[in-house]
Each structure stands twice: as structure tokens, then as C-alpha cells.
């Protein structure tokens, strides 16, 4: 379709995204300019901002249904804002009512939750338009603007053939390449584990996050049966198989050292890892740039590994590397998944409205707390505008809404970027307004600035805010010729809005990740227990095994993300976090063992029933000991609960099989985690959620 150079340019993620966002903004302005209605064309540019926040450009099997819902909510919020303000209803009451009513969308699902800030932004934009036009005009702008936004994005995705999904899959393959290369380079290096493991954990976290993102995109497109979707589904299944075999670990450093001393295994293992990583990067480019993959083989590399494994049959490292690299090579050579499974067997269903409403009305509902926090912040912002005698405090309200993110760390970063970017943008715009640039040149510069801002938006929000601020100032200059009067008040409004958002995040029902560490650790242990049950069952099936393996990886990822965010939160006990960091490291080892055991169970390398039952009982008792240590304050304060002792596994005659070795190491890690949590508990905070004596009382 395109020559190679243009293909790399047009399919580049940042360029493709910037072109799409710039065209959907600027085409209505161009049409308005040609028709002599530049004002309406510029007002249309308000609607894509609401649609972007609502995620209405997300490829979805119910794309147009979501579009209708979004347009209806935007128009309804705009109408209610104008009518209630005309009845002299105080603005804080209006914003509180809208926020609390729309907050139920968060109970329906993460994609529906985006409708809350988008609808509130539509109401805030209406504040700036009220008094300048009839009541029906903002409604028409939102309805037609959303329709235009939806049709343009549908046409764009139809032309570029599911480009957002291709971008996610390409990033996943590239992350797997980096992870494989880094992991097997450390396998043969004498590196301090405390320094070597954190970078690997970060790469593993990114890979699992991308897998979750790809799965959500696949689910949202699951109604499609076209060839492109089926090809993307197959590529995603291959990525799951690759991640499964790349992320396994043997954890026998002594055996690795013996094999390295007796053979040239170090060079061969690194050769295999680098070959796999290079091929994954080529496949990442093929996916992104719509190219068919070329033929691939790594027979020489696998042959060298097989020779080492044959020459050293008593060393498990050679067999381990040969077995997993041969599976990886098979996927890369055949371009087919290792086994058949129903990837979408576990359907994600949104909660029906009435059960969602019932859950939302509970005081323990995170969605209700988030809506309450946002309503208080917006009310304070509107009262601040009244105290400063601002006729319309829409800029303070908009700043609060745009910088408030899910979590302390993300909100703090967004506040810094937004405030600095706005200040720089206002200074540049103030200087530029003195030059009295003609309208045609002004529109051209606005187009270039918008394109440049979207090009860097994903990587540098602060610099993108500079461009958006300049464009906003010139939009007001073209609409109402008051751009210079706008600069200083908007600077003050931005600072006030950022301060309100920061205060609300810290003091209004804060959801500290440090307070969720126990719950997330408990959930991860439950996922591990269910995975071990499936692995040691009499007839493990591939699809349930695959799903539970991903749940295990995602549960550990949630725990790891909580720990990282907790370490950035203010005034928290660093000794407790240091202990929990060690706990999470052992949790990662268990995940790697479960990944390895899943492949063994799928190939029916099972233990004898009596031995499997014995190991299952030992693992369950060890997991329950860890859970009880997390749940209760201290031994003896748990009432009727029984803090169980870990059983001693009796050694069996004969050499233990690979599966049995993994199970023994899992039990060892669980015992270590129990000891760590016993020490960490003494360092815990003594306030807030930590005053709950039992974990299940604070799970909501």
C-alpha cells in the first residue's frame, strides 16, 4: 500500500496518533473557515477533548453504541448546566449532583468509568459558552461534534486496519525481546541479586501490563470475524506462549556455575537469547508496519544447546535451557501457537445497572468515594472562583478535572507537568500576541502547534501542554478578541486548580497503595493456590491452565505496582516497605515456578496421585500460613483461627522430577515469605486501614 519509507512514517505510533487527532480537530475549523463560520469550527474543537477523555476513540465491538451514549451524556450535562444555572442553582450543588449521579459508571467497568470526567468536562465547557449563544447551540455542537468524531475515527481505523491493537502487540514483542536478552545475560553473570532482580521485575511488569492491555483490546473487538482480527488473535496467542517460556526460571545458581565451568554453555545460552531477542524485534516491526514475516530458523543455536544437554545429563540447567528454547524456536519458526485454546473463554461482562447501583450506594464503594472526592474538589474550586469574583470559574474547574488521576503519584506528576506547561505556554502566547499576526498565518501556526503537541503528548505531557495552552489562547483571541486579558487570570486559575487537586488527593479519602499491600498480597496468594490446584489435578486442561497462569501473573503485577506506588507516597515507614519488597521478590520467584509447572502439566508430566496430593496439601498449608500472617495482628490474637505449622516434606526415593523440584522450591519461598511478613508486621503503620484487625474487614 505504501513504499517502505512512507510505511515506516505513516504507521509510526506517535505520527499516526498525531495525524488522527490533528485532522479530527482541524478539519471542522477548515470547513468553518471556507463557509465563513470560523467561530463554529473553533467551537467544534471542544468536543474531541471530551471524546478523548471518554475513550470514544477506542476500537470496540459496540463502537457506535458507546458513541450514542457519550453524545447523550454530553448534551444532557450541557442542558442541565444551562437550565439549573438559569434557575439560580448554586454551581457547587450542580457539580456535586452531576458527579454523584454519574459516578455509578465506574461500577459498570473501567471503560465506562471514563464517561464521568468526560461528561463533567462537557458541563464545564458549557459554563464558558453560557450567555454567548442560545441554549440549544451547545447541545447541537456536542451532538454533531461527537458524531463527526466517531465517524472520522471509524473511517480512520478502517483504513489503518486495527492500528491501535497492532501498536500494543508490537510493544509487547519488543518488551519480550528486551526481557529475554536481559534475563539470560544475567543468568551467566555474577551479579548481586539485589541489583540484578529489580530491572528484571520492571521488564516483567511491563510485559504483563501489555498482555493485559492486548487482552482487553482483543475482547473489545471479539465480535469481529475478519481476517485481520484472526491474524492479530493468533499473534497474541504466540506472545502468550513466548512469555510463558521466557519468564520461567530454574533458580539453581550452583548448577549454572558448574555447567559454565565444564562447558561453553555461557556463550551458547547467550547466543540463543540474543537470536530470540533479535527475531522478536523483527516481528515487532512486521506487526507495526503491516509486513508479512520472513522465514526463520535457529537450528544451529538449538543444536548447540542440545549437545550441551546431552554431554551433561546430570546437570538440569542444560536440559532446562534446551527444552524452553526449543519451544520458543518452534513458535518463532512456525508462527503458530504451541497449543489450541479459547482465548476469550472467560468473557468479561459488565455489571448490570441495578447491581452496579446497589454496589455504588455502599459507603465502602471505591467508585462512590472517588465521586465524592471529585465533587468536593469541584465545589471548592467553584467557591474559590466566587471568592475571587470570577464571573465563570471554568478554568479552575477544568484544571482540577484534568490533573486528577488515579493515585497520588500519577496526580502529583500530572500537576507538575500541567502547571509548568501552562505557565510556559501562557508566556509564549503573551509575547506572540503583541505581533498582531494575520488570521491566516495564525491558523497555520495553530495547526503546526497542534500537530507538534500531539506528536510528543504520549512521551512528554508537559511540553504538549505548552502547545495546547498556546492554541487555547489564540482560539479565544479568534473567538472573542480577549486573548491578552486571558493570560494572567488563567495562570492564577491553573495554580489554584493544581493546589485543590493535590489537596483533595492527599486529604479526601486517599486511596494509599501502601494500605492495599496486604489485600493485594492476600489476593496473589489465592491465585497461586488455585494455580497449584489445577497443576496437580488429575487431568489439567490447557484453557483453564492458561487462564489461571495469566491470573497469577496479573495478581503479582498488581502487588508489584502497589509496592512501587507505595514507595513514592509521603510519610510511610521505609522499613516496612523494605521488608515487603523482599516478600514481593519471593512472590516473583513463585510466579516463575508456576509458569514452568504450567508447561509441564499441559504436557501431562504429572506426579503420581498420592505424591501430588501430598504436595498439594503442603502448598495449601504453606499458603494459608502466609495468608493468616497477613490477616491477623499477631499469633494468639486471631481468636478461633488456627495458625498452622508448615509440614516437613519427606524426601522420596529416587531423583526428584522437574515438577517436584519446582514444588519444593515453591514451598521454600512460601516459608521464607511467612518469616518476612512476621518481621514486617512489627514495622506496620498504626493508623487508618491498618487499625483493622482482620484483612477481610478492609478488603472493600
From Swiss-Prot:
Membrane topology field: Multi-pass membrane protein
Q: Name one GO cellular component term.
A: plasma membrane
Q: Which Pfam families match?
A: FUSC-like (PF12805), FUSC_2 (PF13515)
UniProt entry keywords in alphabetical sequence = Cell membrane, Membrane, Transmembrane, Transmembrane helix
Where does the record place it? Cell membrane
Transmembrane stretches, start-end: 24-44, 67-87, 89-109, 115-135, 139-159, 383-403, 420-440, 461-481, 491-511
The similarity annotation says:
Belongs to the YccS/YhfK family.
Name of the molecule in the record: Uncharacterized protein YhfK
Q: Which species expresses this protein natively?
A: Escherichia coli (strain K12)
- Which gene name does the record give? yhfK
